[in-house]
Amino acid sequence: MDVRFTEVGYTYASGVEAVKNVSLDVPTGQRLAIVGQNGAGKTTLVRHLNGIFQPTTGTVEVGDWVTKGRTIAELSARVGYVFQNPDEQLFARRVIDDVAFGPKNLGFDQERADAAVAAALEATGLTAEAETHPHHLSLSERKRVALAAVLAMETPVVVLDEPTTGQDERGVRMIASIVAALHSQGRTVIAITHDMDFCAENFERVIAMAQGEVQADGTPSAVFALPAVLEKSRIEAPQLARLAEALGWAERPLTIESFVDALPAHRTSAG
């Protein structure tokens, strides 16, 4: 399902203008990462998708729905939102109940709900913790419970707010595989992240924000090659790109595969 922001602005009651005239089209099935320092307007922008915020100016559309006037309950059928802090969305006494809440609320029949819950628990590595109280789990595990709860809803749009924060290497790989699976299913994935390596390796489009405005919009290789954008957005290029720069390479590979592919040519020139 496609998503569209048209000249969206949002001003808090305090008078702070958090989002300024942002226009974006996100096609169905795209993987989009939004990057920038804290306070850049990233979370404020995407929280318009699930109805938590309504735009001060402009319009937000999810598929053929304009979000303004739609309830959070209505929008939850189209947009699954995984919060940065999992405790904002976990409330049940058992993991399985948190994960089952969405399908039940969306009116899934029992067979479909059971299948969706089982698949979500398996995808997030939580099958063995199904009967555990979420607050007896670690932060990384609770974040995976929150993710499982959204996966079970089978929404066409999935929003991930800082999905890799607090995750170990195994957890990051698991989330990357989930993003790939969602993409293969034709679902739209929008992630807010400070993890530039995760961003570069798993998303085909990157938007850099600063002070409520879009500073750059393009492929990871294009955006991370713009020093002025990196400076204004207060972000660093991915580690492999910085390593290539330190080695004096002209190109800036962003993934392990592209870095390895470039090695033979540089070994030849060095020899």
Language-model regions, residue ranges each:
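Conserved ABC transporter NBD signature motif
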Residues: 58-67, 75
